[in-house]
Amino acid sequence: MLAVALRVLLAVHGGVFAALAVPPRRLPSGDAVAPNWDARAVLGTERARVLAGCRIAFSRVVPLGAPPAEHPLWRLAERLGAACATAVGAGTTHVVAAPGPPTDKVLAARAAGAAVVSPGWLQCSATLWRRADEAHFSAQIEG
């Protein structure tokens, strides 16, 4: 974990100082606008790189009738830079699935060659601040 923290802190340090090196923009009024060198913004940018390019659907993770975008794992995936969807489509790269029999989403993901992973994959990716190896988080699908 210390190695992860060091890697993230070095990236944030580099991002803050890169922003400080950028000259301020000028508004039409002539006022200068300084670049955003706030470490919180740099942290958000670094976090959003973790799953950038991933398009994720969820199967048996979000309770039926609940708004998917309010589920903690959906929100975590978005904070990590993934695009979340309620259905498996042509661009789906991952389906995060709870254990159980295969659902239509799981079958569609497998047919399209998308990874079917457990919720632990998202949590591990968040902890490590990098995309976890999908091979270690294969969803426990019966049959």
Cite the ranges covered by each PLM segment.
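Generic preference for flexible, low-structure residues
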Residues: 25-28, 47, 72-74, 108-111, ...
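Eukaryotic nuclear low-complexity, Arg/Ser/Gly/Pro-rich intrinsically disordered regions
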Residues: 1-49
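Ser/Thr/Gly-rich flexible loops in soluble cytosolic domains mediating phosphotransfer, phosphorylation
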Residues: 116-143
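Interaction modules related to DNA damage response and DNA replication/repair
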Residues: 44-124
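Intrinsic-disorder/low-complexity coil detector
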Residues: 22-23, 27, 34, 98, ...
